[in-house]
Amino acid sequence: MNQLSLLAEFGEPITRVENALAALREGRGVLLLDDEDRENEGDIIYSVEHLTTAQMALMIRECSGIVCLCLTDEHANKLQLPPMVINNNSANQTAFTISIEAKHGVTTGVSAQDRVTTIKTAANRDAKASDLAHPGHVFPLRARAGGVMSRRGHTEGTVDLMQMAGLMPAGVLCELANEDGSMAKTPEIIAFGLKHNMPVLTIEDMVMYRNQYDLKLA
C-alpha cells in the first residue's frame, strides 16, 4: 500500500493539516512525513512554545537522537549561527548550523531537561548570540524562506506548521526510528501516531492546504 492509502484513516489532506494544527495548539506532537521519493521518513514535531521535558525524553527514546531546532532564517541570523559547513553537498541540502548549548541553566547539556533549556533559550524572541555556547547537543536548522512551497523538507514543514497554528515560529524535530535502529516508514509511523495520539500528515498535505487557502508565510 502506498502512503496515501495508508493515511486514509487520518482523513483527507486538509483535515489532516487541521488536526495537526489543533494538536500543536494543545501542546501535543504531530508526525510529519515527507515525499515517498525523498527521504520517505517521519519526524516527531513539537512546538517550542509548549515543549516539555517529558516530550523531549520521548523524542530521545523513540527517535534517532539528533534533536533539531527549526528556526526562521531571520532568527538564526539574530543568533549569529553560521552554517555547520561552508560547502553543503548533502543530498537534501539540510541547512544545519553549528550546534548549540545554553550558557546558563544546564549541566552537561545532553539530558532531556538540558536540551529543553537550550531550545527555549535559543528560540526566545529576545535571545542573543551571547546566550549560547558552541558546540552543543542541539542542532539548529534554518528554514528556507517560502517554507514548503520553496523546499519540501521537514525543516520548512515544521516552521510553517507553527506559523499556521499561530505559535512562535520555532519547532523541534527528530526522525522516528524502529526498535532495531532502522528508520520508521509509513506503516510504523502511523502505528506510533495512533498509539501516542499524534496526528499524521505529509508535506504534500501542507502544500495542498497552503494552495487552497493561498497562505503566504514568512
UniProtKB/Swiss-Prot annotation:
Co-factor note (free text): Binds 2 divalent metal cations per subunit. Magnesium or manganese.
EC number(s) recorded for this UniProt protein: 4.1.99.12
GO biological process terms on file: riboflavin biosynthetic process
S-S bonds: none
Annotated positions for site Essential for catalytic activity: 137, 175
Residues bound to Mg(2+) 1: 39
Entry keywords, A to Z: Lyase, Magnesium, Manganese, Metal-binding, Riboflavin biosynthesis
GO cellular component terms given for this protein: cytosol
InterPro entries hit by this protein: DHBP_synth_RibB-like_a/b_dom (IPR017945), DHBP_synthase_RibB (IPR000422)
Cofactor entry: Mg(2+); Mn(2+)
Pathway the protein acts in: Cofactor biosynthesis; riboflavin biosynthesis; 2-hydroxy-3-oxobutyl phosphate from D-ribulose 5-phosphate: step 1/1
Amino-acid positions noted as binding D-ribulose 5-phosphate in the UniProt annotation, renumbered to this chain: 38-39, 43, 151-155, 175
Binding site for Mg(2+) 2: 39, 154
Reactions the enzyme catalyzes: D-ribulose 5-phosphate = (2S)-2-hydroxy-3-oxobutyl phosphate + formate + H(+)
Superkingdom, natural source: Bacteria
Gene Ontology MF, one: 3,4-dihydroxy-2-butanone-4-phosphate synthase activity
Pfam family, one: DHBP_synthase
HAMAP family: RibB
Assembly description: Homodimer.
Family designation: Belongs to the DHBP synthase family.
Role this protein plays: Catalyzes the conversion of D-ribulose 5-phosphate to formate and 3,4-dihydroxy-2-butanone 4-phosphate.
Protein name in the entry: 3,4-dihydroxy-2-butanone 4-phosphate synthase
Source species of the chain: Shewanella frigidimarina (strain NCIMB 400)
Biological classification of the source: Bacteria, Pseudomonadati, Pseudomonadota, Gammaproteobacteria, Alteromonadales
